[in-house]
Amino acid sequence: MAHDETSFDDDSPREACGVVGIYAPGQPVAHLNYLSLYALQHRGQESAGIATSDGERITVVKDMGLVSNVFNDRTLAGLDGHLGIGQTRYSTTGSSSWRNAQPVYRGEFQREFALGHNGNLTNTEELAQEAGMLPGTITSDSDLVAELIANQIGHESNHNASDGRELERGLVKILPKLEGAFSFVLMDEAHIIGVRDPNGFRPLCLGKLDNGWVLASETPALDIIGAHFVREIDPGEMVIISATGVRSIQPFPVERINPTLCVFEFVYFARPDTQLYTQSVHHARVRMGQFLAKQAPVEADVVMGVPESGIPAAEGYAKEIKIPYAQGLVKNRYIGRTFIAPNQELRSLGVRMKLNPLRDTISGNRLVVVDDSIVRGTTTRAMVKMLREAGAKEIHMRISSPPYRWPCFYGMDTGTRSELLAANLTVQEIQDYLDVDSLAYLTLDNLLEATGTNNAGFCSACLTGDYPVDIPVNLSKKILEESIHKPEKSSATQREKISGGIQQSFSEIHE
């Protein structure tokens, strides 16, 4: 009998990914990567992986699950080296499977490299066809990029003597062909390389250790290992870290540079202790609540936030409107993102496994309930029912972002437009569907002002439908896996040979 997997995050955008790269001679780089990935666990919980090099070979360990599930003292001890990269993954192109776990490894033409990716390419099918790749042999956009780079390195190896900079030159050739969202960390035996797409959809920053350098998706990944924040990697920038220090080059045409950081990094994705555009994410979320209170005040007894990312906005709302803030929902911190339930009756209990009401806060009170977003509405509706049962007199829902009406193709998994509640219902209809006494969303202008960045440049396509990079009509999460043909056996066998080194390393370490 088939069991269904029920998500606890139906009313929030699904995670992006987290990447880290560390160059630190004399330091336990595998352990530093492990700690930094812990700080980025919120960005992806499907799989985790680390690749390291001792200057002669690359070793990769990756598996499905959380960072703490994949790594232990024994696996980390097997990851020798003074440089390494890591990734926590949530699938946005390609299914959730070991084959698509990262870092992606290639070892052809006597040149090894590994790649970690946060984002989502929008021209994958075009790139695969241009490269003459057999449909079905590439199952994620990250794997596709690695294949393109490997082919370019192979082409150069046939015409030039090796000087150790083949990966850098291969990237300079391949990167201008890529469209969409990508923050990459890459490594060969001697270099760590970081790349941010010309729009800067996903964050990437540079930090300094006493004896090395760090690249990471968010600043807490620097803090946890004692690295000092230096700066954000600019949109369209490529940085190369080696024994000689840090170099920066611009591999993209200047006309493609158009900073549009995903605004939902401020709303939901990033940790509250992250700095983006030099601004505190936590303080930005508090300001969102303050703007929301000015925009949509209501008479109430208590303001409460939906854990976790709704809490700072709720605190800001309460402060501005001068109504007491109180915790009204307790989150089970040890529940996974999904659980397996055999029938609808048990599936309907999903929200109760994640959240439990504090009746002393709720019973007999008029509540303002603040959350960061509503995507599908199923979890919010179940939560409202739970609050009613706990004795709420009134429930006024306040959302610290505008209505989520359009799917994201730049590194978030939001489903199709038909699944998005605000794309199909008016605000009044959503209010009726949720069974709340009132509903209000923060305006886009107020959201952007709350970030405190002086309109530094944001993508808000999921709110407006204005996509900064063109989207193919047939783009989907599994576009590379849903190709016309399955790979022939000979090609599949060849791919096993190509990736055999990484699989052998993985199995040996986990024996």
How should these model regions be labeled?
Residues 1-235, 240-300, 306, 394:
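Conserved short alpha-helical segments that host acidic/polar catalytic motifs at enzyme active sites
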Residues 29, 92-93, 123, 193, ...:
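Flexible loop/turn segments at secondary-structure boundaries
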Residues 116, 187, 195-196, 207, ...:
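Generic beta-strand/beta-sheet core signal
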Residues 143-148, 325-336, 433-451:
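A conserved beta-strand->alpha-helix junction
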Residues 155, 295-301, 319-326, 361-363, ...:
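Secondary-structure transition/capping motifs at alpha-helix termini
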Residues 173, 221, 228-229, 233-237, ...:
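Phosphate/diphosphate-binding loops
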Residues 175, 190, 226-232, 385-511:
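PRPP-dependent phosphoribosyltransferase catalytic core
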Residues 322-368, 378, 405-413:
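Short, glycine/charge-rich flexible loops or terminal/linker lids adjacent to PRPP-binding catalytic cores
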